[in-house]
């Protein structure tokens, strides 16, 4: 029986390691792997997509990047920076996002943030099968909410050696204390009953943040606007409930055993769109919330406030993001 078990395990590992990558939309330096997941509700077919930069030879340390809401992996420069520093680079497009979106999916739909744990596990399984022995998990925005919860849930057998959070979504950025203390719990409760209720309507015109980063408007960065909309989609009560419940869990404190680096802008900005303004601060989250809750997610947390950083810090202006990379790689020498 033991021999049969070993043979089965070896067969599974060989199958995973030999999985077929194919060319990625980002071009010659990237390739992608589609990983089938268990069917979703009502038999919905679900997949995860793992993207990797052309691998370095004989390197067994790697970064796994997890994107945010209304997002996917497109940050080629970030991948190149890690490669230059001797890190393999991988990114995951979560189910119902980006490369993992299928025509029958509702974009970004989720009822519990923990649904994304399967995407992360599948990515790490594949990375380990490819020989990765040291893995740094990196999450941005909603990915920066999912990844610490993942690390906490798996803390007794964590396969992650460090966690980097880029403007993590630790709390709702609402207009008043009443909205946060009364409105959020109410909408969250209603989300258990009226799941498709649109608590926030979408906008057909580009938002300020989208305009500030897209090369089709005032920004520097090319990305697929079908995968990352510059306008906003409606937010459902079910999605709001999933986020609210995740926030409550994180805000009570986590016990993540690995070193954590939390990065955020020095200021939150809002108001009518102005190019200079929107390129100088976080137009999505309240950075004070990030600073408030960061210290409570583990025992080894480093916080860095990034002057002039925008919401996705690695998309900030060159004079902001290049020194930021230096800080990240210096921290990774732990």
How would you label these PLM feature ranges?
Residues 20-57:
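N-terminal cap/lid segment of alpha/beta-hydrolase-fold proteins
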Residues 142, 146-235:
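Alpha/beta-hydrolase-fold enzymes
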Residues 60-68:
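Short beta-strand element of the alpha/beta-hydrolase
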Residues 69-70, 98-134, 320-321:
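Catalytic nucleophile-loop/oxyanion-hole region of alpha/beta-hydrolase
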Residues 69, 93-98, 169, 307-310:
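Short beta-to-alpha linker loops that shape the active-site pocket of alpha/beta-hydrolase fold enzymes
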Residues 71-74, 79, 83-103:
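Conserved alpha/beta-hydrolase
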Residues 300-334:
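Catalytic active-site module of serine/aspartate enzymes centered on a nucleophile-bearing elbow/loop
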């Amino acid at each position: 029986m033991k021999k049969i078990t070993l043979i089965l395990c070896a067969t599974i590992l060989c199958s995973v390691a030999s999985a077929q990558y194919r060319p990625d939309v980002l071009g010659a330096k990237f390739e992608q792997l589609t990983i089938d997941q268990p069917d979703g509700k009502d038999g919905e077919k679900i997949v995860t997509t793992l993207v990797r930069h052309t691998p370095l030879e004989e390197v067994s340390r790697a970064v796994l990047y997890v994107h945010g809401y209304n997002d996917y992996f497109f940050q080629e420069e970030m991948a190149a920076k890690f490669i230059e520093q001797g890190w393999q680079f991988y990114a995951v497009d979560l189910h119902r996002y980006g490369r993992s979106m299928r025509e029958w999916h509702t974009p970004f739909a989720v009822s519990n943030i923990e649904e994304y744990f399967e995407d992360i596990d599948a990515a790490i399984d594949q990375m380990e099968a490819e020989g990765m022995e040291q893995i740094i998990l990196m999450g941005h925005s909603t990915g920066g909410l999912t990844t610490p919860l993942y690390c906490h849930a798996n803390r007794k057998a964590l396969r992650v050696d460090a966690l980097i959070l880029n403007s993590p979504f630790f709390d709702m950025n609402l207009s008043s204390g009443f909205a946060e203390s009364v409105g959020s719990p109410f909408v969250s409760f209603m989300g258990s009953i009226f799941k498709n209720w649109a608590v926030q309507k979408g906008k057909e015109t580009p938002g300020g943040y989208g305009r500030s980063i897209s090369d089709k408007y005032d920004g520097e960065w090319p990305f697929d606007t079908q995968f990352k909309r510059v306008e906003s989609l409606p937010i459902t009560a079910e999605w709001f409930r999933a986020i609210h419940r995740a926030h409550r869990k994180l805000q009570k404190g986590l016990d993540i055993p690995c070193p954590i680096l939390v990065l955020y802008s020095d200021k939150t900005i809002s108001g009518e769109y102005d190019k200079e303004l929107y390129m100088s601060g976080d137009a999505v989250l309240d950075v004070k919330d990030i600073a408030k809750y960061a210290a409570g997610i583990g025992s080894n947390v480093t916080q860095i406030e990034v002057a002039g950083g925008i919401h996705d810090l690695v998309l900030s202006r060159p004079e902001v993001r290049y020194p930021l990379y230096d800080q990240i790689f210096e921290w990774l020498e732990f």
